[in-house]
A protein has these predicted regions:
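A short SAM/SAH-binding and catalytic strip from SAM-dependent methyltransferases
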Residues: 1-9
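Residues at alpha-helix caps and immediate loop-helix transition turns in enzyme cores, especially N-
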Residues: 9-10, 89
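A short glycine-rich, Lys/Arg-flanked "PGG" loop and its adjoining helix->strand segment in the class I
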Residues: 11-26
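Alpha/beta-hydrolase-fold catalytic nucleophile elbow
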Residues: 30
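Substrate-binding/catalytic lobe of Class I Rossmann-like enzymes that use SAM or dcSAM, i.e.
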Residues: 33-148
Length: 148
């Protein structure tokens, strides 16, 4: 799973993946994404998660990832949104978290942390279940052609 800022750096600006792969080589990446409209809204102002959980984070859209590989020899071979399944994972994490609050408190976490973490897990679950937030598994392949 990639850090929110990592795809553009790994795939485009730094050229690290393009340089590391041989022609025909494949690279797989799992990354949380947003539809283009939500991506643009994130860029204009911080949402709750950007403020409290991942300060400065910016999840890309699939189009942003595609643009980041435009001047490389990388080709997008597959992109699957597994967000609906990830929503179920988040629900299980939240239920497990709530079932173990005594252990959480015993580790020194206060009620503010507990409320924030429960809200974060529920917010993410809802986002993935509705498609507002996506979780893409992407496969890229290094082509044999010349970059334009």
């Amino acid at each position: 799973m990639a850090d929110p800022a990592a795809p553009a750096v790994l795939l485009g600006r730094s050229g690290a993946v393009d340089r590391a792969l041989r022609p025909g080589g494949k690279f797989s990446l799992q990354v949380i994404t947003f539809p283009d409209v939500a991506y643009e809204a994130q860029r204009r102002g911080a949402n709750w998660i950007q403020t409290y959980i991942f300060p400065g984070g910016l999840c890309p859209s699939l189009a942003v990832i595609e643009r980041s590989i435009h001047n490389t020899r990388l080709l997008l071979r597959d992109a699957r949104d597994i967000g609906p399944s990830y929503a179920l994972t988040l629900r299980a994490w939240r239920e497990n978290f709530l079932a173990n609050l005594d252990a959480v408190r015993a580790q020194g976490f206060d009620e503010r942390f507990i409320r924030m973490w429960e809200y974060y897990l529920a917010l993410c679950e809802a986002g993935f279940a509705t498609g507002i937030t996506q979780d893409h598994q992407i496969v890229l392949e290094k082509g044999r052609g010349i970059v334009a």
